[in-house]
Regions:
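Short, flexible helix-loop junctions that flank or precede catalytic/ligand sites
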Residues: 1-193
Length: 193
């Protein structure tokens, strides 16, 4: 196992690829918007697509969102515009009891205390590898990943965490990229169990 610091340049990327080609598991980091951005960053560094598709197994992305303060949490009904901005319909959440922090001494009257991570994990199956080899655009790779691997976006993971009472739509909107259309809430909740 080889753990590299952040891959910032072509030399480091080539080193990681060469190590992977010789059978080593290589773990590293990128600063990108999402999982597809990690693949595109390698392509931008002029790493050949056949090397990317033959060595990369998966790409993970994460963001930290503020967590609702458990000491001052209270039920609330979100505004329709707030729900629509995350890609849901108001009917999806009308009968749910969502939570929001009122603000207290513990959370410095913000309504939030601590952090919670939202994740996105892209597993490179054959369909995704073929899309990379064909140099398909990011939105096509994302669509293929969503359809064939069940890729859940960070935004969708965040929505599930709102429904489960950990954070708010406001946090999800401010901290996660909108990378594709949000699936129906029922499907998101099934995929994030």
């Amino acid at each position: 196992i080889i753990v590299l610091g952040e891959i910032r340049d072509r030399i480091t990327a080539e080193t990681a690829i060469q190590a992977a080609l010789t059978g080593h598991k290589v773990y590293s980091t990128f600063h990108t918007e999402d999982t597809i951005g990690g693949l595109l960053r390698l392509i931008d560094m002029q790493i050949e697509t056949f090397l990317i598709s033959s060595t990369v197994i998966s790409v993970a992305a994460q963001r930290l969102l503020r967590r609702i303060c458990t000491l001052c949490t209270a039920p609330y009904a979100p505004a329709q515009v707030e729900v629509e901005r995350v890609g849901l319909r108001i009917e999806d959440v009308r009968d749910l009891e969502l939570k929001k922090g009122r603000g207290c001494k513990t959370c410095n009257y913000t309504g939030y205390f601590g952090r919670i991570a939202v994740y996105e994990l892209l597993i490179l199956n054959e369909d995704v590898k073929e899309a990379i080899l064909a140099k398909r655009p990011a939105h096509v790779i994302r669509r293929i990943s969503t359809e064939t691997t069940g890729l859940v976006s960070m935004r969708e993971d965040g929505i599930a965490k709102v429904i489960r009472g950990f954070t708010t739509f406001e946090e999800v909107l401010s901290q996660t990229p909108r990378t594709f259309e949000t699936r129906p809430l029922r499907q998101i909740l099934q995929m994030t169990q």
